[in-house]
Amino acid sequence: MKPAFELAAFTVRDGDEAAMLAERPAMIEALRQAFPGLLAAWLTKRDDGSWLDVILWRTRAEAETAARHVSDVPEAKAWFGHIAESHGLQHVDVADQQLFIPTLGSASEQVTGP
């Protein structure tokens, strides 16, 4: 079984960015509880101001199952309310991996800033 990434591109409603970021940790934890195959999550902001959510799943099947049932998780459904426009959801299989740093930081070391 190969791990897979889920890539979700979107824009955020005007004025919702701070709330979206503040609510994300609880939303991701709720997803982790609902879908044990969730291994890691990164939220990235693109140069054009849009966002790309990058989720690492144990398997593509677990990613696809979660995508079908994500709206059953109340925290996720509420968090999606911050999304102005979806630019698509994609699942991609990891073909090769080179893991040099097992973690980029704990929850207490989350990246913050501009």
Regions found by a protein language model. Give the residues of each.
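Short, surface-exposed ligand-recognition loops at beta-strand->loop->(often short) alpha-helix junctions
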Residues: 11-22
